[in-house]
């Protein structure tokens, strides 16, 4: 393996970094979920400023191996960062956060990341569709955009039962505070409602009927989606049918009990065993020969152990970088919007080198 390093020209943009944060509070939401709020020291306040829709990555070491998980921020902009966590059976992180973490504990937390960002200055009409723990980014988006006096929000929130609704009291408080500007609709799949339309899963047919009855889609400025793969796919399909432009639909995927989706396109046919891959990060350039059978993120780990990542599943967007030179194959993408892809951005955890030389810039 050959490695070359050099310093690049302009100063790089600020990169997400880990810092030890003290847990301020752990609030029980349901039997299997909590909200964890962090204290941020004065010197890190600016670094941990977040936009509605962004996420925090939590890091811990178990048995000498580093693990990371990304969790959506569920606080209004300007408040202390807070994440919502629902336990996954035998989950390495979720069980720890739900049952073991206490106020006063110190946790390694990365500064906010993510391209799912709502701008409260825009006002407008917003449609939010969430299922289960997909409500977490919606808590930040809804509470933030409604600070604009002209903003309106319709939130369709799917759960199994009323007892499994995360942030039930806070959602009721938001409804009381904003009245007719917030239309809150609970849809339950395992608990009968008085209205049949509100009983069942948020699948395509029910979404069509809900939107026809409640939401003039042609007046929607932005749609925000968060939940499991099936709900996201159905929501995007229905909104497309109803004429909402794709660049107005923003989504975040949660993988819970979902089979891996099919590749979005066939794998590229490559020749040769390796590519010379150049990594630009924090103003430092590193070039190394890497196998074409490994993702750029995994292949570069041997020479650059400072690369940003979290889920490694093409979902969180933490490993986003711009493909500046060469050809590469991004096999899955559930984090970048089409505009970002058109600008050359890729998820390095899902991108494999194809050409003899490839350059990706994390500072772009």
List the model feature ranges, each with a label.
Residues 272-308, 312:
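C-terminal accessory/binding modules appended to enzymatic or scaffolding proteins
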Residues 286, 299-308, 317-364:
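Iron-sulfur (Fe-S) cluster-binding segments and ferredoxin-like electron-carrier domains
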Residues 3-106, 110, 124, 159-162, ...:
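Ferredoxin-reductase
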Residues 1-15, 20-22, 32, 241, ...:
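Iron-sulfur (Fe-S) cluster-binding modules
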Residues 95-269, 273-278, 285:
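FNR/FR-type flavoprotein reductase catalytic core
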């Amino acid at each position: 393996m050959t490695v070359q390093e050099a310093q690049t020209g302009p100063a790089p943009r600020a990169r997400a970094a880990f810092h030890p944060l003290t847990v301020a509070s752990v609030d029980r939401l349901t039997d299997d979920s909590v909200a964890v709020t962090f204290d941020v020291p004065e010197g890190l306040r600016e670094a941990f400023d977040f936009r509605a829709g962004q996420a925090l990555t939590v890091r811990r070491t178990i048995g000498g191996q580093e693990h990371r998980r990304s969790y959506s921020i569920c606080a209004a902009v300007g408040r202390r960062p807070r994440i919502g966590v629902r336990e996954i059976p035998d989950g390495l992180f979720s069980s720890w956060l739900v049952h073991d973490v206490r106020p006063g504990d110190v946790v390694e937390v990365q500064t906010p990341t993510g391209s799912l960002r709502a701008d409260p200055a825009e006002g407008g009409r917003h449609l939010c569709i969430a299922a289960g723990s997909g409500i977490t980014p919606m808590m930040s988006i809804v509470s933030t955009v409604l600070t604009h006096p002209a903003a309106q929000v319709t939130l369709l929130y799917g759960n199994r039962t009323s007892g499994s609704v995360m942030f039930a009291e806070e959602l009721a408080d938001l409804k009381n505070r904003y009245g007719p500007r917030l239309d809150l609709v609970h849809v339950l799949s395992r608990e009968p409602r008085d209205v049949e339309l509100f009983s069942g899963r948020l699948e395509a047919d029910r979404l069509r009927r809900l939107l026809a009855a409640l939401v003039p889609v042609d007046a929607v400025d932005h749609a925000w989606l968060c939940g499991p793969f099936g709900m996201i796919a159905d929501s995007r399909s229905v909104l497309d049918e109803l004429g909402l432009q794709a660049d107005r639909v923003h989504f975040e995927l949660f993988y819970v009990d979902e089979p891996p989706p099919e590749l979005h396109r066939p794998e590229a046919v490559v020749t040769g065993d390796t590519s010379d891959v150049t990594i630009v990060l924090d103003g430092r350039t590193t070039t190394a020969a890497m196998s074409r059978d490994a993702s750029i993120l995994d292949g570069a780990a041997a020479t650059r152990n400072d690369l940003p990542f979290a889920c490694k599943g093409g979902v969180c967007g933490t490993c986003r970088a711009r493909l500046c030179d060469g050809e590469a194959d991004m096999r899955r993408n559930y984090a970048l919007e089409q505009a970002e892809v058109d600008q050359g951005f890729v998820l390095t955890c899902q991108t494999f080198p194809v050409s003899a030389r490839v350059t990706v810039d994390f500072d772009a």
